[in-house]
Design a protein with these regions (language model features):
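M16 family metallopeptidases and their MPP-like homologs
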Residues: 8-18, 31, 44-155, 168-176, ...
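Short Ser/Thr-interspersed hydrophobic loop/turn segments at strand-loop and sheet-helix junctions
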Residues: 39
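Proteolytic maturation boundary segments
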Residues: 1-2, 155-234
Length: 234
């Protein structure tokens, strides 16, 4: 999508699974590790901390009665667009194919449990949680059993769920930019997906030390429409 701006905007993703999928909790853990856990997540480390491509990168699953979606997104300077796509896509490919680190998984579980009280920080949050339990016909002990179900998930469970439900070779990319080289983009994605080719990622030394601030949004979202931070409805 052509758009005249100093910032380029990138989203890549594909359809995913339903809310009642047995892998859902493992996928929520995986997402927290990949891009849903702030500065501790893989995408933030690769795109912001190491290279300064963006102020923020995130990933997300949506789950409902019908098939939801998996996506990752970020914004960057126009002249860093192709390098950033190479890094983000390669990080996703590696996440799918490399083993899950057991210590990182346990830290992610602990973080999810610590953030659980945020789901009940207001009457509206409590009402939403109870409504979700009723709508999806979950057991009355669903919330009480949540920590035990979370603790029972192993690195292999997460790895199997990732390989079943995340497909770097089947992504749809939406790129808002005033200068996109589609042939170069196709070449980058093909190289990332080829296990026989070892690519060198853009090194932090190649990146300017200062990132220009993003352009202000034309209209701020109202408090009623603002999205809340993690965790989503459990």
């Amino acid at each position: 999508i052509l758009f005249n701006s100093t910032q380029a905007h990138v989203t890549m993703g594909h359809l995913s699974t339903t809310r009642d999928d047995p892998d859902r909790l493992a996928l929520e853990l995986a997402n927290r590790m990949l891009g849903g856990g702030g500065f501790s997540s893989i995408l933030m480390k690769e795109l912001r901390v190491k290279r300064g491509y963006t102020y923020g990168a995130n990933s997300a699953f949506t789950f409902s009665q019908a098939a939801g979606s998996f996506s990752l997104s970020y914004s960057t300077q126009q002249d860093q667009l192709m390098d950033s796509i190479q890094v983000a896509h390669k990080a996703l490919v590696d996440f799918v194919h490399q083993p899950i680190d057991a210590q990182q998984l346990e830290e992610t579980k602990a973080g999810m449990l610590r953030s659980l009280p945020n789901s009940y920080s207001s009457n509206a949050n409590i009402n939403a949680q109870l409504g979700s339990i009723g709508f999806y016909q979950q057991d009355a002990n669903y919330l009480a059993d949540y920590p035990k179900r979370l603790a029972a998930i192993t690195p292999l469970d997460v790895q199997n769920a990732i390989r079943k439900h995340i497909h770097p070779e089947s992504l749809t990319l939406v790129i808002v930019s005033n200068a996109l080289d589609k042939e170069q983009l196709r070449h980058i994605l093909e190289l990332n997906l080829d296990p026989n080719i070892k690519q060198s990622m853009p090194h932090p030394d190649q990146i300017p030390a200062i990132i220009e601030p993003p352009e202000p949004m034309p209209e701020a979202a109202s408090p009623d429409s603002a999205q809340t931070d993690e965790p989503a409805l459990i």
